[in-house]
Amino acid sequence: MTKPVYSKTPSNPEKSCKSRGSNLRIHFKNTRESAMAIKGMLLTRAKAYLNNVLAHRECIPFRRFKGGVGRTGQAKIFGTSQGRWPKKSVEHILSLLQNAEANAEAKGLNVEKLKIAHVQVQRAQQQRRRTYRAHGRINPYMCSPSTVEFILTEVEKAVPKPAEESAQKKKSVATQEISA
């Protein structure tokens, strides 16, 4: 088996960890929406959020693949009206996040500061089955599995930007330099 190739390399490999699941038998559309919902979250918040989804306390907002998705009041927080609670996708994503957390601990990173920097969900190869129909016909019965990858990076303390001098100060300094 070949080494998994990630679609993105982290900017600081020493301060980041990765996790990847290939050909997972979970619906691509549900998994994509679930992964996009946690992108940019801290690891602790993402795990709490996904556990709340499993308990139906929060929902996953459906933005792209939303045809036929029912409405729920829990989606108002995200600025949309449609949402679901995709159990199987959330469980697989939680297991990948736990794997990434274990990888971070093995690297010696601070788990409390980990942020989900990169998420990618791709369609994996469809698996073919068949269903038998009337009059001796056979129709395909395909599944749409997913390949999911996460890159988590340790958040560094942001350095505050120095206050810029106002335009008036710059102008007065310029006139002083000319007169001097």
UniProtKB/Swiss-Prot annotation:
GO biological process, any: cytoplasmic translation
Keywords from the named record: Ribonucleoprotein, Ribosomal protein
Keyword set includes Ribonucleoprotein: yes
Biased amino acid composition, Polar residues: 8-20
A GO CC term assigned to this protein in UniProt: extracellular matrix
Family: Belongs to the universal ribosomal protein uL22 family.
Species this chain originates from: Dictyostelium discoideum (Social amoeba)
Region (Disordered): 1-20, 160-180
Lineage top rank: taxon: Eukaryota
Gene label: rpl17
NCBIfam families linked: uL22_arch_euk
Protein name: Large ribosomal subunit protein uL22
KW ATP-binding (keyword) present: no
Stored InterPro entries: Ribosomal_uL22 (IPR001063), Ribosomal_uL22_euk/arc (IPR005721), Ribosomal_uL22_sf (IPR036394)
